């Protein structure tokens, strides 16, 4: 025989308000991942916990427009706007990938007013690892 489902908890017992607590973050790391199809900008604290992120896709760009420099610039601006409000003044920038949005995202980060301690390219380079996909024939 099936047991009846007990209704435990009501609206009074649930947590109210926003789950995000606003922390003051003086220093952080800005990760820019620029592929040919999209650009993703993630802002973390120095321990690696994500504070804010944005991508060209979440900014409303669809299809081939996601890989453009303007889309990367918009994504970087959106991700940084949130952390500037939380008091971030200094940051490191780590850029990964071969995409068109690398320089545009870096330009948007520089314009935001955050002091950059260094800019590092962390694109993974194979030491002759996997075989690349076959050449595209159009």
Swiss-Prot record:
One of its GO terms (molecular function) is rRNA binding. Residues 1-23 are annotated as: Disordered. Its main location: plastid. It is found in: Plastid, Chloroplast. Transmembrane segments: none annotated. Keywords: Chloroplast, Plastid, Ribonucleoprotein, Ribosomal protein, RNA-binding, rRNA-binding. One of its GO terms (biological process) is translation. Part of the 30S ribosomal subunit. HAMAP family: Ribosomal_uS11. This is Small ribosomal subunit protein uS11c. It comes from Arabidopsis thaliana. The gene is rps11.
């Amino acid at each position: 025989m099936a047991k009846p489902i007990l209704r435990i908890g009501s609206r009074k017992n649930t947590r109210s308000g926003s789950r995000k607590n606003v922390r003051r973050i003086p220093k952080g790391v800005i990760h820019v991942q620029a592929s040919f199809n999209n650009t993703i900008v993630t802002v973390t604290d120095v321990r690696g916990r994500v504070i804010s992120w944005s991508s060209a896709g979440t900014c409303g760009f669809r299809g081939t427009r996601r890989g453009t420099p303007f889309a990367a610039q918009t994504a970087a601006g959106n991700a940084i706007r949130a952390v500037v409000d939380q008091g971030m003044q200094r940051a490191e920038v780590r850029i990964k990938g071969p995409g068109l949005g690398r320089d545009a995202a870096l330009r948007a980060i520089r314009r935001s007013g955050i002091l950059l301690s260094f800019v590092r390219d962390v694109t993974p380079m194979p030491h002759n690892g996997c075989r690349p996909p076959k050449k595209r024939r159009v």
